[in-house]
C-alpha cells in the first residue's frame, strides 16, 4: 500500500478458493471505499466435473489507493462485440461496446504462439486491458508474482516501465527468455537476504 502511487490501482488475480479471503484482507488494508471492482475473467477451458458446477472463471479484485484521484481510462481499452448485435443500431454494433466487469477471454492455448511453457501463464490480452485502463504511457507497473512475465511483456508493448518480481528460478528463466525474444531491454537483479 505504501509504495502505490496516489492515483494507482491494485489488481489482484485469484481463483474461487481464495478471493473471498483476499477481499476481506484488502478491505481492511485499503478501506472498503477503495474497492473499485470485482472482475470475473470467464473462460471455457479446463476441468470438467460431474459432481459440481465446473469452475470456469477467475476473480480479479480491483482497489485504488485514493477513490478521489485514481486513473482510469476506459477509452484506451479495445471495445468488444455486442452479444446480441441485432438489438442495437448497426452503427453501435460496428463500434462495439466497452467491456463490463465480466471478461470473456480464453486461457493461453497449449499450442499457441503466446505459450511460454510456464504453468500459470496469463493471456496477454488480459494484462493489456488492465494496463491500458489504469496507467499512462511512461507509468511504472509492478508485478510481485511475475510468473511468465506477461505483465512486463504487455507493459513494454504499451510504453510503460515495469518491475517484475519472482523468486522461482524457472519463472526468472522464462521471463528473461520472453523479454529477450521480444527485444525488450531489462536488467536482472538478484535480491540479497538482509538480516533484521
PLM segments and residue spans:
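PRPP-dependent phosphoribosyltransferase catalytic core
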Residues: 170-196
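Core catalytic lobe of class I
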Residues: 1-174, 181-182
Amino acid at each position: 500500500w505504501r509504495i502505490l502511487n496516489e492515483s494507482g490501482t491494485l489488481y489482484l488475480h485469484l481463483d474461487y478458493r481464495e478471493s473471498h479471503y483476499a477481499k476481506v484482507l484488502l478491505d481492511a488494508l485499503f478501506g472498503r471505499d477503495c474497492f473499485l471492482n470485482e472482475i470475473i475473467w470467464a473462460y471455457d477451458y479446463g476441468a470438467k466435473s460431474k459432481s459440481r458446477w465446473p469452475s470456469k472463471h477467475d476473480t480479479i479484485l480491483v482497489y485504488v489507493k485514493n477513490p478521489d484521484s485514481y486513473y482510469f481510462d476506459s477509452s484506451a481499452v479495445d471495445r468488444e462485440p455486442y452479444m446480441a448485435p441485432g438489438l442495437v443500431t448497426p452503427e453501435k454494433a460496428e463500434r462495439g461496446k466497452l467491456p463490463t466487469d465480466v471478461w470473456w477471454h480464453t486461457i493461453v492455448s497449449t499450442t499457441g504462439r503466446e505459450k511460454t511453457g510456464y504453468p500459470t501463464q496469463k493471456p496477454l490480452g488480459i494484462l493489456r486491458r488492465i494496463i491500458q485502463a489504469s496507467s499512462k504511457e511512461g507509468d511504472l507497473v509492478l508485478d510481485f508474482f511475475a510468473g511468465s512475465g506477461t505483465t512486463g511483456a504487455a507493459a513494454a508493448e504499451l510504453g510503460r516501465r515495469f518491475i517484475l518480481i519472482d523468486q522461482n528460478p524457472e519463472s526468472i528463466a522464462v521471463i528473461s527468455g520472453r523479454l529477450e525474444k521480444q527485444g525488450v531491454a531489462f536488467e536482472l537483479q538478484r535480491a540479497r537476504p538482509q538480516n533484521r
